[in-house]
């Protein structure tokens, strides 16, 4: 950020840069030149035996030719590919960003949510989930009555989402038009139809629903999700003041639907763990730990029950992608890409997002054969200290397509 007082103060106090030099830093190359000479002089003072005749920088013409040679070779080996891939993105600089482009050297890490669209008289109520297999256990929808949502046009459909979600969708190659603001409280008590059933389910209020997470609307699976179970208990007990007396009476018959069988867990594992941990309301921080414990066990050991249509008897770990494909085929699903370690800020100060880059060139770090060769080469290397060897292996495993250039 221009005239960043914190950065300027760091130059003065931490790096002892003279005031006159700082004024020259309006040109980025001047910053690089200054610290280049500072680091070099420090190495000379420490007596490093370095042949400085071989000195170069990454913007030297000769080095740039070397990089061009590398890219030509990678393209010949089909390791540079063209396509559409998600990247960390600075909306201000209009550039892809990776670890060294962010404040604090944070690698933008993101995950793919499945959006499942519930229908409210032709208007889509989209929920984002990492667990599409739990669709068969949905009893209701959660919305935060204190949040101002937006009615938006997404391509040819009308959706209700949080403003934060509407903005994220705009970076994912979707045509977004904001129609109007709407209050979450307006939807409490209304009914929607689920994509897998002709039954109607009710929209209920919940304070744990965050507008900056997913679509700002959540599907409720109280048998297997501790947050959902406790929020349902709060609603049925009359603790939630956003529920009027008529709605309170109507929701008393909502019961958790068990749809996953897991060795070591009961039929309603969310209820069991909430009671075991002494959780008494939906804002209890212990719900995070309860959620992680159940989800981990169900993912690796869970089997889908008989009420999950053609997926009954399959392991969660195997059926998850199949269910995602099924929901997509029947036209009731979409994709939302979300940063998992937000907020991530670009060095310019702007908050980064996930953007879907189309028809761009990428280094195909997801290529399995390339990863395999990299692991073989790495095994032959001496690493000091050896304790960090595993960290390199992890990086090789998680690396995926990366944009070749900033613009």
Label every PLM stretch briefly:
Residues 1-136, 191, 199, 213-407:
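Residue patterns forming the tRNA-binding/recognition surfaces of aminoacyl-tRNA synthetases
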Residues 132-217, 226, 230:
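Protease-associated
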